[in-house]
Amino acid sequence: MTTVAGGVRASARVLARGDGRGGTVLPVLEGEGPLAVRRTRGSGAEARVMLVGAMSGPLGGDHFEVGAHAANGARLRVGSAAATLALPGQDKAGARYDVRLTVDDDAELYWLPEQLISAGGSDLTVTTSVDLAAGARLLLREEQVLGRAGEEPGRLTSRLTLRIDGRGVLDQELLCGPGAPGGWDGPAGLAGHRAVGQLVVVRPGFATEPPAARVFEEGAAVMPLAGPAALVTAVAPDALRLRRLLDGALASLD
């Protein structure tokens, strides 16, 4: 961890590999400062890792980076111990949170952090970059809550890119809060909802049997992507309803 003018810079890194006996080992498990990583009890061939926030933030001016790589034969599940709370800092600059995920052939990554809460007065840019081999499997969940109870949201910019076998499959950006383009909270945007989320599901079997595009209950939709992948998007009045929508849509894909 380093402290620079205006904020903290910290990173965490996880590398998982198949052990050749049907299990998964973690040769790299590194974190610093506000980004602590802990191995927890896994199940079967799966290794589980928890991101633990050792400090509050990100605050204005902070820059956090997290990387996870599921190498050949690995089964890796990554979660977080609590929600991430973006807060304003003494520095008026925005904060950054960059996530880079890589999954090799015959490997699987479940990326399931808790919600990101954009507190009033905060300014956070989140980028998630995912690179998958042709035979990789992925479940990625993103959930954003705009403001705490009774509070207007901060400014939140979130971009997600997905590449499979070197080919771009998804590149989308969400901008909410002060300074966002007009209409972000209108009928064509979030329509007054304060929780928004998505799932990206990549399974080789989707190449021959892609899921059908459909509405899943009120506020959620399932869409096939141009690859062995599906995207679930949802909006809801609160984090609890959002999670229920995403979980239900995921179950419908099985």
UniProtKB/Swiss-Prot annotation:
Protein's UniProt keywords contain Chaperone: yes
UniProtKB keywords: Chaperone, Cytoplasm, Nickel insertion
Keyword Cytoplasm: yes
Gene Ontology cellular-component terms listed: cytoplasm
Any GO molecular function: nickel cation binding
Subcellular location: Cytoplasm
Pfam family, one: UreD
Subunit structure: UreD, UreF and UreG form a complex that acts as a GTP-hydrolysis-dependent molecular chaperone, activating the urease apoprotein by helping to assemble the nickel containing metallocenter of UreC. The UreE protein probably delivers the nickel.
Similarity comment: Belongs to the UreD family.
Role of this protein: Required for maturation of urease via the functional incorporation of the urease nickel metallocenter.
Protein name in the entry: Urease accessory protein UreD
Gene it is expressed from: ureD
